[in-house]
Amino acid sequence: MKEITTTQQFEQEVLNSANPVFVDFWAEWCGPCKAVSPAVEELSGEYKDKVDFVKVNVDQNNELAQKYNIFSIPTLAIFKDGKVIAQSAGAASKESIRTYINKNIQTEASA
């Protein structure tokens, strides 16, 4: 899963992507973020070629966090055609995240 480190990279990888993009807004010090991370990593493999997955460290990318109103973490957002189409804050199970993705992009994982 790709780590976004600049606003320019976010534009390229997320806003200009042909695929829907799942964005994990997180921070190093955040316990719930660390709890969600393995599930997000596994799902990124299941959805490859259908959904792009990226991580944004809110401490290193404060401007992006402010722009997208990230007030609590983890926040899991889905972007499509350069716009946020779904956003959910808080830790969630792998199954909950899978349901969230399927509901918002109308696709099933190949796994």
Predicted regions and their residues:
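Conserved helix-turn-beta segment immediately C-terminal to the redox Cys motif
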Residues: 18-20, 37-56
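Non-catalytic, surface beta->alpha helical segment in thiol-disulfide oxidoreductase systems
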Residues: 72, 78-110
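Conserved redox-active cysteine motifs that mediate thiol-disulfide chemistry
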Residues: 25-39
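A short beta-strand-turn-helix
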Residues: 3-20
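Structural microenvironment flanking redox-active thiols in thiol-disulfide oxidoreductases
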Residues: 56-65
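Acidic phosphotransfer microenvironment of two-component signaling modules
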Residues: 8-11, 62-63, 95
